C-alpha cells in the first residue's frame, strides 16, 4: 500500500495539474470506487459537477482537494492499487478505469481514478473547522508535518504498552508510516521491531523520528517506492526508491552496515525485515 512518500508524490502532481480547475462532468464507472460516498455514485457526480478544486492536501496516507470554498473536500484513498492519473482526454481508457473527471477549460486533460483491486476510492465529505475531511479527523499528523509534536509523540510512546513497530503503524499516534518505511527507520535507528516503547528514552525516540523523516524525504526525492506498476505518479511514472532500501525486502542479503544476512519474520499478517546483529531483539522477545 502506498505510504506517505508515495501519496505526497501524487499530491504534488494534483497540485500542479488539477488545483484551480473546475469540474464539468464526472463519470462513475464502478460503484465500489465510491462506496465510501454513502449517498452513492449519482450524488457523487452531481455534487462534483461545477466544483472548483482548491489546493491539494495530505495527511499521512490520505489526500484531499477542497471544493465549495473549502466547506467540503474530495477525499482519496489509494488502497493497494489506486492511481490518480492526469491523462489527455483522447487517451485510451485504462483497463481498470473507475472514475473520470472532465474540466471546463481548454487544457485537454482529465483526471482518472484507476484501481485494479478496487480497495481504494474517492468520496465527498464535509470539512472540520481545521479544514480536514470529517472522516479522517482522528488521523494523527505525520512526521513531515511542520506542526508534528515530537515531545507529545515521545510521551505517548512511553505511556503505551506496545512495541515500537506497532506504534509506528498506529495512525492515531503518527500517520503515514507503513511497513516499508517502519522497517527502514528501525534499521537506521538500530532498533528491533519488538522493542517495548516504554524503554525508549527521549533521545532514542528523537533519533527514530529523525530517521523516519530522513528516509521519507529520501524516498520523496526518488519518486517513492514502486515494486510493480501499480504505484505511479499522476503522469503514470514509477518511483525508484526500491533500489535504495536498506531493510525491506532484503531477506538473505548482506546488511549494508555490518554484512550479516538480513532476516524476515512474520509479523501481524505482514513481514518485518531486520539485521539480527545491528537490531538485536529485546531480552523478553524470543
From Swiss-Prot:
Gene3D superfamilies: 1.10.8.50, MutM-like, N-terminal (3.20.190.10). It catalyses: Hydrolysis of DNA containing ring-opened 7-methylguanine residues, releasing 2,6-diamino-4-hydroxy-5-(N-methyl)formamidopyrimidine; 2'-deoxyribonucleotide-(2'-deoxyribose 5'-phosphate)-2'-deoxyribonucleotide-DNA = a 3'-end 2'-deoxyribonucleotide-(2,3-dehydro-2,3-deoxyribose 5'-phosphate)-DNA + a 5'-end 5'-phospho-2'-deoxyribonucleoside-DNA + H(+). DNA binds at residues 96, 117, 160. One of its GO terms (molecular function) is zinc ion binding. Binds 1 zinc ion per subunit. The active site is at residues 2-3, 61, 270. A zinc finger (FPG-type) spans 246-280. Coiled coil: none annotated. One of its GO terms (biological process) is base-excision repair. Signal peptide: none annotated. Its cofactor is Zn(2+). CDD domains: EcFpg-like_N. InterPro entries: DNA_glyclase/AP_lyase_DNA-bd, DNA_glyclase_Znf_dom_DNA_BS, Formamido-pyr_DNA_Glyclase, FPG_cat, MutM-like_N-ter, Ribosomal_uS13-like_H2TH, Znf_DNA_glyclase/AP_lyase, Znf_FPG/IleRS. Its EC number is 3.2.2.23, 4.2.99.18. Keywords: DNA damage, DNA repair, DNA-binding, Glycosidase, Hydrolase, Lyase, Metal-binding, Multifunctional enzyme, Zinc, Zinc-finger. Belongs to the FPG family. Monomer. Involved in base excision repair of DNA damaged by oxidation or by mutagenic agents. Acts as a DNA glycosylase that recognizes and removes damaged bases. Has a preference for oxidized purines, such as 7,8-dihydro-8-oxoguanine (8-oxoG). Has AP (apurinic/apyrimidinic) lyase activity and introduces nicks in the DNA strand. Cleaves the DNA backbone by beta-delta elimination to generate a single-strand break at the site of the removed base with both 3'- and 5'-phosphates. HAMAP family: Fapy_DNA_glycosyl. This is Formamidopyrimidine-DNA glycosylase.
